[in-house]
């Protein structure tokens, strides 16, 4: 290893710890927020080409609770990547913002930049997509879930500046497409511009960095470390890292390693760490796993 390795910018520990606590509180709020709150997710169905009826009739392809849905709420039509919703006569389906759906309507997925959120009783719904795959799902959440009030974040390791480390960004000559297995058995493809190299436990370690979109202002890290055999989620954790500066340096704060969505809901499409991101290191920082992960 070379000798030149800058230290992270110094921080005042009390301020650092307070910022971390605020980050934890904001994370808890996001997890129970309608539209995006993983804890509220109660259904996920992959949408096949053609017609998919949904409602409370147990013989339908997508079955919803009868307290929220009539026997047939509507039919989802998929043609390629285009999705249309045909409501049944008198269906209580609404656009989430309040307009009733009375005729066949195009639905934008949550990767289209024009997401259509639906409401049916206490349920919210939208079409969900993942990067690098043409698979689409109907995602359903319960806005009246008692978990909005009762949910608590899992414990985390004590916050420590020791796990705030400088990393060198090593870009590839050209960005690469890297496929990640997901918990459903499928594959998700992300763009990776390069790798982050950091030092811990007297050695250098590498993590493949991912950009979730061309507009990303941070790297998305999907990682595993040896604490997964003891305290943290067995399948790995996620982490957001600021983009490298003009000198190709950034700071990784492992205190903010967090559980993937599949820890809190079985109705997810979580990407799993690739072999390149399995660290031979115990990262004793960040979120631990709950007593009973959902997946």
Residue ranges of predicted features:
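N-terminal pre-domain segments of enzymes
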Residues: 2-43
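Forkhead-associated
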Residues: 41, 46-116
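A short, sequence-level motif marking secondary-structure junctions
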Residues: 67-69, 107, 130-133, 209-216, ...
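Mid-length scaffold segments of soluble, non-membrane domains
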Residues: 69, 75-80, 189-232
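Short, isolated positions in well-ordered beta-strands
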Residues: 100-102, 125-127, 203-207
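Surface-exposed beta-loop interaction hotspot
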Residues: 119-188
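Intrinsically disordered, low-complexity Ser/Thr/Gly-rich stretches
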Residues: 209-211, 218-227, 233-244, 253-257, ...
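Extended, aromatic/histidine-rich regions of cofactor-dependent oxidoreductases associated
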Residues: 228, 249-251, 255-295
């Amino acid at each position: 290893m070379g000798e030149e390795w800058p230290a992270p910018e110094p921080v005042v520990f009390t301020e650092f710890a307070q910022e971390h606590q605020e980050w934890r509180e904001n994370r808890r709020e996001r997890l129970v927020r309608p539209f995006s709150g993983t804890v509220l997710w109660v259904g996920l169905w992959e949408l096949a080409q053609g017609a998919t009826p949904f409602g409370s009739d147990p013989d339908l392809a997508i079955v919803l609770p009868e307290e929220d849905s009539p026997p047939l709420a509507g039919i989802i039509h998929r043609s390629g990547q285009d999705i249309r919703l045909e409501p049944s006569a008198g269906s209580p389906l609404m656009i989430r913002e309040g307009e009733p759906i009375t005729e066949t309507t195009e639905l934008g997925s949550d990767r289209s930049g024009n997401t259509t959120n639906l409401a049916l009783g206490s349920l919210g719904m939208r079409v969900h997509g993942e990067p690098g795959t043409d698979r689409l799902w109907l995602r359903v959440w319960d806005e009246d879930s008692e978990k909005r009030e009762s949910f608590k974040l899992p414990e985390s390791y004590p916050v420590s500046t020791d796990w705030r480390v400088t990393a060198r960004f090593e870009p590839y000559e050209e960005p690469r497409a890297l496929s990640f297995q997901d918990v459903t058995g499928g594959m998700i493809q992300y763009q990776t511009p390069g790798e982050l190299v950091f030092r811990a436990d007297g050695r250098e370690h590498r993590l493949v960095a991912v950009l979730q979109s061309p507009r990303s202002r941070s790297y998305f890290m999907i990682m595993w470390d040896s604490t997964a055999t003891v305290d943290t989620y067995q399948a790995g954790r996620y982490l957001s890292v600021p983009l490298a500066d003009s000198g190709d340096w950034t700071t990784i704060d492992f205190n903010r390693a967090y559980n993937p969505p599949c820890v809190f809901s079985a109705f997810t499409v979580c990407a799993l760490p690739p072999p390149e991101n399995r660290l031979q290191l115990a990262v004793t920082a960040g979120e631990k796993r709950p007593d009973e992960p959902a997946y």
